[in-house]
């Protein structure tokens, strides 16, 4: 039996020292206003996959069994104080923290503290399709299934009020890291029982209850989310503001102006065109770091003509990536050629792009029997993301590139939550999307985004290659990093050869904030956490 209290992920060291804006905090202000980029689809982290949703719930309202250190990738104890791992790597026994209180609100008054029943409810709801709560409120859990946890967790047992044992079918080298991600945020079993009794199970997604540093107060879509500092938080020194407010605006330029005017203290995803003005403002800080991210085009291989490799190859080599980098990222992006960033361990540096060659692309389309003037849809995100600061402009440039080879792309967009929902349903032909790493493990890219288990979730290409999938799953089932690297490199070559995606760029992440903000740290995972953050004069 191996005893663990803290483990370290094997991500490149360059990400471990994430950017920090800090000084000795001054007198704390009552309000911290965050100019956020979009409305969350809901407040139940298990249902979602985007940073917008996670910022609004997982990073505010909830905790998990394990957690990542602020601004880094090291895994620390969370609601579990410690854990034991069996010698065969298939059994994890978690020793739960005592004295942790769930939020008390006008819609729920807890009668007990956090215990093993809450862990069981959180995971059994995702595991069991016949779970009473899931039957009352049917929903999907994309991360849980995309990562194969629905198949790999054999059982969860309550050993006592503060001890829980997970038994896996296979070794999962990233299991502890996975539990620190947003999706397995611990829910209150008592609150769930109340909702079932009231016939309001869906309220778990609209009126969240957690153990986190901030208590949900109210939400007005496309306007604001309000939270109160949790005065009963189990780490009271980490709550340094009375009120946390998300001021929602999808326009990056408007967010920048609000920041400059002092209408908010922190924002995110600035337009590259606004960076110079933000840098020159004496009232602002503009910390940055290399993004652990990827912006890419996903081709839906279940739609014709994308089911043909030659078509995907043609579209890929017709993309003028350098022009996109220059116009869209404006010096804040690096060309991408692989399905994950170069700072991820196991990245294969031998993988190169096919040369930009519109003439050859035309030949490939002709060979595939694709007629001149064939129409397709190209979906563009309505919001700025860390990996794509201007999806509209990128889509217009791709539209122009593909027109040169006889493909007419119609640009389509939806509100962010609807965009993701429809894309998971496979309505798109090609789409702009991207990813910020979640846990420092290669499986979070190669399995979560391109694996067969993820075709109904984050695998927006709907691509499922048996050979590729076996390599990725075999890599996850061993803790030998050398063997894992070898398997992942083989998988990366298959991914490149089959072209379910066109990687575009890895961006530099900027986090503008006023100089009155103290101790905010940029997350390598593209999330925004506000515990331990204060606002001075």
From Swiss-Prot:
The keyword Protein transport applies. One of its GO terms (cellular component) is outer membrane-bounded periplasmic space. Pfam families: SBP_bac_5. It comes from the Bacteria. Coiled coil: none annotated. Belongs to the bacterial solute-binding protein 5 family. Part of the ABC transporter DppABCDF involved in the uptake of various di/tripeptides. Prefers dipeptides with acidic residues at the C-terminal end. Involved in the uptake of phaseolotoxin, a toxic tripeptide inhibiting the enzyme ornithine carbamoyltransferase. PANTHER family: D,D-DIPEPTIDE-BINDING PERIPLASMIC PROTEIN DDPA-RELATED, PERIPLASMIC BINDING COMPONENT OF ABC TRANSPORTER. This is Di/tripeptide-binding protein 1.
